[in-house]
């Protein structure tokens, strides 16, 4: 199945969806947004990474930024923060460049590495889009974390690719229905920029601050 362009979802929404389905729906279906220091800090970090005019050659590495990607099969479109091309026999030809070059997407994140797949899903989806666009295989990429100023290598395993596909199918279905799901609040809600928009709708008879305190006490 191939999605039409008007049905494409934002690729960056994968991270929101994996973190909290309700948060994703509030942003992408209800078009609600609120800033906190985390979102502002993250926006600043991405500002330089999305400089589409930037190109640089460092030895056997060619670096570009803000590269648009899409996949009709997945029904998403978005941008790679940084797309590097590493010279190698398994790569692809690039116009005006000698040899073969392996695409290597790099995504910028503000914090530290996570134990779940919230961050890696978005990067993997970028790679899957690039594979479709460039007719090549991309086995890995990297996440750069601003807090530790270091890259973490990410392998695009069959399991990670399957999770990307499964979540996108669910996202398309919710978007088609225009449905904002309810979720069980947790201590993670305390750091969410949308908590004052989200929680009052979930807890009509209870103060948000009181609910958050209870959720934090109940969570391990």
Go through each PLM region and give its residues:
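Cysteine-cluster motifs in flexible loop/terminal segments that predominantly coordinate metals
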Residues: 20, 179-220
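Alpha-helical structural motif
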Residues: 10, 21-22, 122, 160-167, ...
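Nucleic-acid nuclease catalytic cores
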Residues: 77-78, 84-178, 190, 194-196
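Metal-dependent nuclease catalytic cores that hydrolyze phosphodiester bonds in DNA/RNA
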Residues: 1-105, 205, 214-220
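Short, intrinsically disordered, charge-biased short linear motifs at domain edges
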Residues: 4-7, 170-186
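Alpha-helix termini
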Residues: 29, 33, 148, 191, ...
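Structural motif
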Residues: 9-15, 117-118, 180-187
């Amino acid at each position: 199945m191939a999605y039409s362009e008007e049905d494409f979802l934002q690729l960056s929404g994968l991270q929101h969806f994996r973190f909290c389905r309700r948060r994703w729906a509030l942003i992408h279906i209800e078009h609600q947004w609120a800033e906190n220091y985390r979102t502002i800090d993250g926006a600043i970090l991405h500002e330089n990474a999305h400089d589409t005019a930037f190109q640089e050659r460092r030895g056997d590495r060619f670096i570009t930024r803000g590269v648009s990607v899409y996949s009709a099969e997945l029904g998403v479109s978005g941008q790679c923060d940084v797309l590097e091309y590493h010279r190698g026999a398994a790569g692809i030809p690039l116009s005006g460049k000698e040899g073969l070059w392996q695409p290597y997407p790099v995504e910028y994140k503000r914090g530290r590495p996570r134990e779940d797949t919230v961050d890696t899903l978005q990067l993997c989806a970028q790679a899957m889009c690039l594979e479709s666009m460039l007719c090549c295989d991309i086995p890995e990429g990297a996440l750069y974390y601003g807090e530790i100023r270091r890259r973490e290598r990410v392998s695009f395993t069959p399991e990670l690719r399957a999770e990307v596909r499964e979540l996108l199918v669910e996202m398309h279905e919710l978007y088609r229905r225009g449905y904002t799901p309810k979720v069980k609040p947790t201590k993670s809600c305390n750091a969410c920029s949308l908590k004052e928009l989200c929680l009052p709708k979930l807890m009509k008879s209870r103060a948000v601050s009181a609910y958050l305190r209870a959720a934090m006490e109940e969570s391990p």
